[in-house]
């Protein structure tokens, strides 16, 4: 028997993309945060209050690497937890690498999601450019936004350190989660009508 976490939205990305920092910023969860890969070794849940009497559960999924769907970096274990979410929040670090390398990182995570499950590949996804407060990110943010938008993604640029953009992102996630909940209710009603 296997226990899978139940969350409304899941944070995905490479190690050190800023997933734990974002979860700590927007919820009461206190994941370990450090500047080395695989600080997060197990999924962590946080409850995000995004409007009066409205909240959602956000899962910090440990970083995914190439080959995760085959178990590298324990990725297959982590991907099982993100299967239960209705919305993926895909974080990319604007401060560490060139725009081309960051876009390749974005593609790597999406390939791993698709290799694990076609359903995950089709899951609604919001792209988030992180660490925009760092001087090394300044030159990359606009081009990353443009290129991610060109792929059809809604894009947010945030700093978990300063909080810049986090409230707007959480509001958007909250609306996305509510939309997902409505779709599930409608699907359940349709399924009941067919029975």
Could you describe each region identified by the protein language model?
Residues 4, 9-17, 23, 97-195:
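C-terminal-of-GTPase-core extension/linker across diverse P-loop GTPases
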Residues 1-72, 76-88, 92, 170-174, ...:
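Conserved G1/Walker A P-loop phosphate-binding module
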């Amino acid at each position: 028997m296997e226990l899978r976490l139940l969350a409304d939205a899941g944070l995905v990305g490479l190690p050190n993309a800023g997933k734990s920092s974002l979860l700590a910023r927007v919820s009461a969860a206190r994941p370990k945060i450090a500047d080395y890969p695989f600080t997060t070794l197990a999924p962590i849940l946080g409850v995000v209050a995004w409007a009066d009497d409205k909240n959602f559960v956000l899962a910090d999924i440990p970083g995914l690497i190439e080959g995760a769907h085959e178990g590298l970096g324990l990725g297959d274990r982590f991907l099982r937890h993100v299967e239960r979410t209705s919305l993926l929040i895909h974080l990319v670090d604007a401060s560490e690498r060139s725009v081309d390398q960051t876009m390749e990182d974005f593609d790597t995570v999406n390939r791993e999601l698709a290799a694990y499950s076609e359903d995950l590949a089709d899951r609604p996804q919001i792209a988030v450019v992180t660490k925009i407060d760092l001087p090394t990110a300044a030159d990359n943010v606009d081009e990353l936004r443009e290129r991610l938008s060109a792929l059809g993604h809604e894009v947010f640029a945030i700093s978990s350190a300063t909080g810049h953009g986090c409230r707007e992102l959480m509001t958007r996630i909250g609306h996305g989660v509510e939309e997902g909940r409505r779709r599930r209710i409608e699907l359940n009603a349709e399924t009941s009508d067919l029975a």
